């Protein structure tokens, strides 16, 4: 999406801001018109087999150069084959896959919000809905199908700056599990 606000050296897109504002008003009005009594449930599972820590602490004598040319980098992503440079993982992962489900008082699915702490990964694609989008598409197909076209699946991005899908502690990376 274009920039909605000026940030990090990028100016807000002057045509996108009013468009976005109008679309936000439309979805708020639509949501308000559909308000109804509902039931909420939640759960969580350990999904550690889908994620691993991707940042590694470097040895004090093997610190790396920062973008300004100073030797200050004590942790780096993707240790890969540089095992002699690191002392270990930079911290624990959050393996929890949390789920919040909303259904009508008649038991019809309305929405599902999932939270997962894993960094996005789009592969070679420059623009992608990534696993967030594919995950939601699959949930919408499997939970609601054509019977509940208003059902919405969402996935929020948990605390995941250091977490990725590949486990570098494994000598041979395990096959990446596909969502399909």
Where are these regions (language model features)?
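Conserved beta-alpha junction segments in alpha/beta enzyme cores
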Residues: 1-151, 156-159, 163-179
């Amino acid at each position: 999406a274009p920039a909605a606000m000026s940030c990090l050296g990028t100016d807000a897109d002057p045509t996108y801001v009013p468009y976005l504002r109008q679309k936000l008003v439309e979805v708020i009005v639509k949501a308000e018109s559909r308000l109804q009594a509902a039931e909420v449930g939640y759960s969580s599972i350990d999904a550690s087999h889908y994620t691993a820590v991707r940042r590694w602490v470097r040895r004090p004598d093997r610190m790396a150069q920062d973008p300004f040319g100073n030797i200050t980098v004590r942790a780096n992503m993707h240790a890969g084959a540089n095992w002699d440079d690191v002392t270990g993982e930079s911290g624990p992962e959050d393996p929890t896959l949390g789920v919040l489900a909303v259904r009508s008082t008649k038991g019809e699915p309305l929405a599902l919000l999932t939270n997962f702490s894993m960094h996005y990964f789009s592969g070679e694609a420059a623009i992608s809905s990534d696993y967030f989008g594919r995950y939601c598409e699959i949930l919408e197909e499997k939970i609601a199908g054509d019977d509940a076209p208003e059902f919405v699946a969402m996935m929020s991005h948990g605390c995941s700056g250091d977490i990725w899908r590949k486990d570098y502690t494994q000598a041979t990376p395990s096959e990446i599990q596909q969502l399909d």
